[in-house]
Amino acid sequence: MATTSHMFMYSLTIQPPTAITQAILGQFAGTKEQQIVTASGSKLTIHRPDPTQGKVIPLYTQDVFGIIRTLAAFRLAGSNKDYIIIGSDSGRITIIEYVPSQNRFNRIHLETFGKSGVRRVVPGQYLAVDPKGRACLIASVEKNKLVYVLNRNSQAELTISSPLEAHKPQTLVYSVVALDAGYENPVFAALEVDYSESDQDPTGRAYEEVEKLLVYYELDLGLNHVVRKWTDPVDRTSSMLFQVPGGADGPSGVLVCAEDNITYRHSNQDAFRVPIPRRKGAMENPERKRCITAGVMHKMRGAFFFLLQTEDGDLFKLTLDMVEDDKGQLTGEVKGLKIKYFDTVPLASSLLILKSGFLYVAAEGGNHHFYQFEKLGDDDEETEFNSDDFSADPAAPCTPVYFQPRGAENLNLVEAINSLNPLVDSKVVNISEDDAPQIFTVSGTGARSTFRTLKHGLEVSEIVESELPSVPSAVWTTKLTRADEFDAYIVLSFANGTLVLSIGETVEEVTDTGFLSSAPTLAVQQLGEDSLIQIHPRGIRHILADRRVNEWPAPQHRSIVAAATNERQVAVALSSGEIVYFELDADGSLAEYDERRQMSGTVTCLSLGEVPEGRVRSSFLAVGCDDSTVRILSLDPDTTLENKSVQALTAAPSALNIIAMADSSSGGTTLYLHIGLHSGVYLRTALDEVTGELSDTRTRFLGSKAVKLFQVSVTGQTAVLALSSRPWLGYSDTQTKGFMLTPLDYVGLEWGWNFSSEQCVEGMVGIQGQNLRIFSIEKLDNNMLQQSIPLAYTPRHFIKHPEEPLFYVIEADNNVLSPATRARLLEDSKARGGDTTVLPPEDFGYPRGTGHWASCIQIIDPLDAKAVVGAVELEENEAAVSIAAVPFTSQDDETFLVVGTAKDMTVNPPSSAGGYIHIYRFQEDGKELEFIHKTKVEEPPLALLGFQGRLLAGVGSVLRIYDLGMKQLLRKCQAAVAPKAIVGLQTQGSRIVVSDVRESVTYVVYKYQDNVLIPFVDDSIARWTTAATMVDYETTAGGDKFGNLWLVRCPKKASEEADEEGSGAHLIHDRGYLQGTPNRLELMIHVFTQDIPTSLHKTQLVAGGRDILVWTGFQGTIGILVPFVSREDVDFFQSLEMQLASQCPPLAGRDHLIYRSYYAPVKGVIDGDLCEQYFLLSNDTKMMIAAELDRSVREIERKISDMRTRVAY
């Protein structure tokens, strides 16, 4: 398999994975505030919980280009800062710190101990750190454990020792935790099983008798070696350990969590055991045992408690009772355990309790939750279960205990953090007639599943909307004096006059302002210390603080057509093409410059930059003319109104704005000229502050209307508001400082301006038709907007209605009681006078039952109703597995909804009692479904597709063509085309691309005359296909279960032969090669993404953009593959990728090239995520790489940002 390619793609992530595999808590910034560090895929993110707002704010995200297996925080004694240890797939232990001044992670230590990759004998799966920060243990699933001693040297720098081994061959490890031993030797506890005897015993008796052991490993700091200190057998179902506080805080030891019970164990204490309470209820199975899946221990002054979570999401509060001495003081001896129900939260991968009284729940599926503690559940009515009533012997059966679930009493949800995990399917379509399509996704599990609309844009908070007497053309706000904090007036310009409103408790019209109300206004500015100016077509009014007015009239037969102002300068353009320039003199009056500059064409727009700090004037005036040019004129006293530079444009400019903004290439600020054209194109070009030269122009198409530009302030930074057919905001990215241009999720505006008042410090005022709107933008760190619609069960697939803006989602939940079964159980309980409480499933989940399925089809309207508008429940224990909208030629091309189901399906090992294909007719414009009939098939039909006016179905390994009959589907043709099971179908013409569950894709041709399906080309690699789409007639893009994306192409000769007239007989009798088809597909590109692709689409994401491949991943990732157009770009980005991989290697020590080649060598793909790391480098490193590539830093940054902005966001 050659790794060179003549096709190249640029791989980019537009939405990072949202599944959190682990979260840790610590004071990573070295302050008293706690931060949360989360691992999502290969991304490491630090968040700041804000207790005042009740929000979790992401501060910084870094891609480590490796698999983060485990995280741990530790602090050296006497230090006030926590460090982070990463266990990854690099075969190295990594210690990093967060540097708040640079807002980045820095690597302190990288120690190699083994092979790379996630292997059973390479440490990295488990990580435990001594509570006093003296040592850490890193362990593998089998055999190997390494202990590193952590210390500091004479310069107070963190040091790490050589590893000490604590290996035990043929031993499996289930959990590792560090004991709290105070200042005695560090001790680590592990749950282990020795399988050496059961491995040798063919009878299976040794396996039945195998014991699970709790083992203590002690690190002797004096002798510098690790000893196996204590072992004790525990319950065989034990799977999790929790550290119990020791030293002055508690008795030390561990909690051992097993199926149905929790035991306290320690080498010098008695064991105590409590059962895990089970739910009461008419629909609950009283025999179902629970396990602990997550938990957290929290220490308070003089006390501690545990919150432990079961697989239902129920939280239990567990406390330890201590023996008291004669004086009533607590001794170090444990008296018993107590457990009681606390609250129910979503099933978590990590639980964190913050000192500020919050609980952070990193959910396994769906949104992550941030709760505030209302109380600690000490004095409530909940039944408490005590270990005194239960035997501590693991062999003795534990009497089940029950509790009644209820609504939340102790926790209050303050923020739900959007998460698309697990993202099961997506569609990219434009149903709202915006200029860009929306991404629709189905994600989540159970009753917490959602249908989401994802849209590129910034969230806008509207404050005021009020109707005006007529349609205004422009609006401004102004202060009265330079020292004012807030604006005093809103000035509205109409076709025949001007209206002034004062800003206070209420907004009212005022008349004694000195403004001319009988003429429209062109510009308003607070000038000098305390005066105002109003520019109107007939002249300039200079309104002094005492309301005296100085008037400068426009020359006869000429009027003012454009104006630009700042606090010391005014420039106006006359209808004759002349530029008149004024400057504020020493006594506060406007002085006109002697000469006027005649321009070659009519002036359409002007711009003066702000006066830089410490200067008396802005040095440049930008002039846009209708001859499609922009000129930069000097305003320096020696060269006033002299031409400095000129730039030709593709259309006449409609707006100009000179703004100083943050510059990612220099790290400081740079002067930029923003240009809006009548054609709807926006340009941003750098303006040299000395020479006035224009360079580094970047363009973006914004919409069909002429662009207007306004300088605004958002979250403390200067930004540009660009208005075309919809509003856009240009700002500096909070992390990279690169320039971002993002649409606002708001109505189209005709004019905008800054607005600042006591109620809204940083807002904007805008005009939309006859309405005045005041709004603000609060967050710039998230440019993907999400709208959610709740679903009933876990979604499996969905499709769009062929014409209407409706979607049909098939949903199915395993081991969940169906609505009919639930209703029957409730009726039975009611008849017996039992409990009939029904808990809300979105909080508590559905009642469970082994072997049961709950499944339905839901109709979603995301445009108008923004809700589920119809549903069909499936009965008889059927689960929906596939869906398609199929037009049947035999029914006059009427489109029917076809749903494939499986009956009595078992997921593992896969089995079922056959399947059905249901046919539904669309009614009421698709908002209702009428059941027609269903056809039994021998296996679940996992793939359905409309094909030439008939139905194509993948049933097991057989591909079939069905037509629609009166009573059932009629089989027309079939062929065994896949080795194992067909999971996906694509088609163009008579060609069908069949995805197999574990054997990649096979191309099949349908010969209409012979009525045969003939496979003619397949793949040479067994790919476990999860998603595929045809890119063109010969090429298919796909993703597999191991996180790879690939593109395969049919050889030209094989493709032509398959389509030849009458080639059916030849193809059927063509000799197969290596038990496959006669031909093999060619691999074009291959890359590892570290997420399972669940859908692929060839589409455009932005208005006027190229076709690209958009893919979604199971963990919530949304990525794109952009084809390169020129070989020159490929060479440049390949060189840049190599330089970045060597100059700034990945944080966790993984080799970047090997990481992207996890299962097969990377081929034909350039990693855009790595290229974008260039923005985050220091200036010196940027310049060094730029010198190596023989380019300027600005040029490299432009090329990187263009790759993204031309096709995506």
UniProtKB/Swiss-Prot annotation:
Question: What InterPro entries has UniProt attached to this entry?
Answer: Beta-prop_RSE1/DDB1/CPSF1_1st, Cleavage/polyA-sp_fac_asu_C, Quino_amine_DH_bsu, RSE1/DDB1/CFT1/CPSF1, WD40/YVTN_repeat-like_dom_sf, WD40_repeat_dom_sf
- Give its localization: Nucleus
Q: Name one GO molecular function term.
A: U2 snRNA binding
Q: Please state the span of the N-terminal signal peptide per the UniProt entry.
A: none
Listed disulfide bonds for this chain?
none
Nucleus as a keyword of this entry, yes or no, is yes
Principal location listed in the UniProt entry: nucleus
Q: Which UniProt keywords apply?
A: mRNA processing, mRNA splicing, Nucleus, Spliceosome
Gene Ontology biological-process entries: mRNA splicing, via spliceosome
Q: Cellular component per GO? A: nucleus; spliceosomal complex; U2 snRNP
* Domain of life per record: Eukaryota
List, alphabetically, the Gene3D superfamilies matched: YVTN repeat-like/Quinoprotein amine dehydrogenase
Q: Its biological function?
A: Involved in pre-mRNA splicing and cell cycle control.
Q: Which family does it belong to?
A: Belongs to the RSE1 family.
Q: Report quaternary structure and partners.
A: Associated with the spliceosome.
PANTHER family registered for this protein in UniProt: DNA REPAIR/RNA PROCESSING CPSF FAMILY
Q: What is this protein called?
A: Pre-mRNA-splicing factor rse1
| Highest classification ranks of the organism | Eukaryota, Fungi, Dikarya, Ascomycota, Pezizomycotina
